[in-house]
Structure formats: structure tokens, C-alpha cells
């Protein structure tokens, strides 16, 4: 049976053709065309082509970043590799599409990519108006502001009249506007499409403030000429739950992506790592471990996968904690403590539904 798939042609921040959502919020969606396509599940499609196409950032250290040889690393990259391991038993069967914030939803809606795993904030508008589903949260964040130490500012409330740079197509534009209006401060906002353009302009001293998610500030700070000459102010002005996104209408694919993330979180809680996964799988007697590692029940079958899908994920990319520590943790250039991204049993809010 044929079905109509809406290809979203543009998602922009600002006034323009389309519709407005909420009180003055300016996320606008233009539908350029309707594509006639046969109804094929995403799982069938990726199996047919032999790989998963994953949408990532254009270069955000710790989350999705390519080295000089084109090898991608980061916690968002690990999630995509984990899905490939779940589907194919091979984490290498994934290709990466670097996308700007403005391009990302169009690429997913049109079918150019199978998963968007690109430091993307889960909001009501995005969840209910764009034909997309967020499959979970792999990093709890909040928006912050970075300034040169030479500015002398100790608080965001000292930034009246500031020139502020950020990216187009993001929640940061709306959040910073709300914050300055609520605190009765004036400001000038300039938005760039590419993150590297913002970094270069800020590094050249063309503005007073660079604002984005605090994890993003930590990542982009590593690219500055003199990182130690800049400081992230203490205020967190928003909630930014970041996570993977898929198209609506394919519950099986949504479940595969969601449960890949859940498996990584549950594995950390149960002490299953990349190094010990096989050994635990062969010796475990705890029913929860047996279910996670495919030794009991038919949980893989219910996803359309082999029963060792989660074991393959953990052996390939490790548990959530391993991924975090490798890419954004205290021993990386980002030096980010776990904070709220610690397990619920260790003072954080990270919590996955059980496999049962």
C-alpha cells in the first residue's frame, strides 16, 4: 500500500511563511512537497542497503566529531554505532551525515538519514508538530553563556547591552531572548548557520557572549586560540534534554533506537561492560542480567532483532558510563562531571526502563 510521506523542506528560526507555535515562538515549518513512497519499514530499508545513515553535528567534540582521517567519535556517534550493532551485529555498519541545526530535521523527515543523533533538544513543538519522535535522552543539559575573562563579568545578569552570538535553528535563540527580557536587559543577537562560524567569530572578538548548551560550550571552548582566557558563567537558563530522533509512524524503529539507549544505561547499572559482557553472559544467574544479555526471554524477537542484540551493543560501544567517560568525562578535554547524567542510584537522574 502506498502512503504519503511529508518531506519537511525547511526548519528555520524567525518570521516567515508557515505557522507559529506557542506565544511568539518562531520555529517555522514549510512543507515543500509531498512524496509518494511505498510503505517500507526503516529496519527493512537499512537491512536492504546494509548500513544505517546517521545524522550528526558538523563537528562537536565529545558528541560527534570527525578526526583528520574521517573517523567519527562521541557519545552521539556511539549511540548510532550501538544501533548498528543491535541490527547487524556489527557497529561499523553506519555512515555519518554532518548536518547544521537548520538542516537536521529536513534530513530526517525526507528520509536522507535514518536516525538523528546530534545534540538535539527534545521540546514539545518538535515532538508534536514535525512528524518526529524523540527516542530518549542521552545527555541532560542546560543552556549557558561563555565570555572572555577580560570582559570581567561574573554573572549573566551583568551582560546588559551585550552582543551575543549563537546558531540558527536552535532553541538557544528563543531561550536567550526570554532570559534577557525577563531580566529587563537589552542585547543584540546574531545567529550563524554553522557552529564553526560562531566559534571563529567569537574567538576573533566580534561579540561579548557565545551561548549554547553548556556541554557545547565546553566542547567548542577546546577549539579557541586560548581556551583558558574564557569562562562559562554559572547561570543555567534552560532545560535541554538531548537525545536521538526518528520519524513518526515506524514504532519498530523507534523501539530499536530507544531500547539501544536503554540497554546501555541498564548495562552500566548492572555492571556489564565492553570487557566483561561475554563472561557475564556465560555465567550470569540473575534474571535481569539474563534478560539483558539475551539468555532468557524473546526480547530481541519482539524488536525484530536477534536475541543477543543488547549483548552486541555493549560489546561494541560499552555501557553508557563507558561512552560518557571516553568522550566527555573528567579525563577528556571537555572535563565534564557526570552531574545529573549520573545513574539515579549515584545521585543523578539517569534511569532506564527495565527489560522484562
Where are these regions (language model features)?
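Bilobed "Venus flytrap"/periplasmic-binding protein-like clamshell domains
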Residues: 51-62, 70-87, 121, 141-197, ...
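Extended ligand-binding regions for polar small-molecule ligands
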Residues: 30-37, 78-81, 85, 149-153, ...
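Single-pass membrane-anchoring alpha-helices
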Residues: 1-26
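Sec-exported extracytoplasmic/periplasmic mature domains
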Residues: 47-51, 84-92, 109-113, 150, ...
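Extracytoplasmic small-molecule ligand-binding "clamshell" domains
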Residues: 37-117, 292, 305, 316, ...
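Acidic, polar ligand-binding/catalytic clefts
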Residues: 81, 85, 89-158, 214-237, ...
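Conserved C-terminal helix/tail region of periplasmic/extracytoplasmic solute-binding proteins
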Residues: 326-356
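Extracytoplasmic/secreted envelope proteins and their assembly/folding machinery
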Residues: 40-43, 76-84, 102-105, 109, ...
Amino acid at each position: 500500500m502506498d502512503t504519503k510521506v511529508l518531506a519537511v523542506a525547511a526548519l528555520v528560526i524567525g518570521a516567515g511563511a508557515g505557522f507559529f507555535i506557542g506565544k511568539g515562538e518562531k520555529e517555522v515549518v514549510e512543507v515543500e512537497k509531498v512524496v509518494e513512497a511505498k510503505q517500507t519499514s526503516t529496519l527493512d530499508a537499512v537491512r536492504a542497503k546494509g548500513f544505517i545513515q546517521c545524522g550528526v553535528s558538523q563537528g562537536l567534540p565529545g558528541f560527534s566529531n570527525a578526526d583528520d582521517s574521517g573517523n567519527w567519535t562521541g557519545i552521539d556517534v556511539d549511540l548510532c554505532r550501538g544501533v548498528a550493532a543491535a541490527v547487524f551485529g556489527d557497529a561499523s555498519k553506519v555512515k555519518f551525515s554532518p548536518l547544521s541545526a537548520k538542516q537536521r530535521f529536513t534530513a530526517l523527515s525526507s528520509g536522507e538519514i535514518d536516525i538523528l543523533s546530534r545534540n538535539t533538544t527534545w521540546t514539545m513543538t518538535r515532538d508534536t508538530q514535525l512528524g518526529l519522535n524523540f527516542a530518549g535522552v542521552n545527555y541532560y543539559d542546560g543552556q549557558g553563556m561563555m565570555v572572555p575573562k577580560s570582559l570581567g563579568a561574573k554573572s549573566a545578569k551583568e551582560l546588559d547591552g551585550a552582543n551575543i552570538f549563537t546558531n540558527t535553528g536552535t532553541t538557544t535563540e528563543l531561550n536567550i531572548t526570554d532570559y534577557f527580557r525577563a531580566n529587563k536587559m537589552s542585547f543584540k543577537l546574531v545567529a550563524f548557520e554553522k557552529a564553526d562560524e560562531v566559534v571563529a567569530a567569537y574567538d576573533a572578538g566580534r561579540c561579548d557572549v557565545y551561548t549554547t548548551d553548556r556541554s557545547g560550550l565546553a566542547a567548542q571552548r577546546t577549539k579557541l586560540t586560548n581556551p583558558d582566557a574564557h569562562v562559562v558563567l554559572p547561570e543555567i537558563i534552560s532545560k535541554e534534554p538531548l537525545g536521538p530522533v526518528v520519524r513518526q509512524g515506524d514504532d519498530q524503529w523507534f523501539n530499536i533506537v530507544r531500547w539501544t539507549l536503554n540497554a546501555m544505561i541498564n548495562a552500566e547499572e548492572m555492571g556489564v561492560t565492553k570487557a566483561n559482557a561475554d563472561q557475564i553472559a556465560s555465567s550470569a544467574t540473575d534474571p535481569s542480567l539474563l534478560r539483558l544479555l539475551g539468555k532468557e526471554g524473546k526480547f530481541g524477537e519482539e524488536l525484530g532483532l536477534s536475541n543477543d542484540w543488547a549483548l552486541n551493543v555493549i560489546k561494541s560501544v560499552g555501557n553508557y558510563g563507558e561512552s560518557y567517560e571516553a568522550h566527555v568525562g573528567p579525563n577528556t578535554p571537555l572535563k565534564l562531571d557526570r552531574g545529573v547524567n549520573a545513574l539515579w542510584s549515584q545521585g543523578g537522574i539517569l534511569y532506564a526502563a527495565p527489560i522484562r
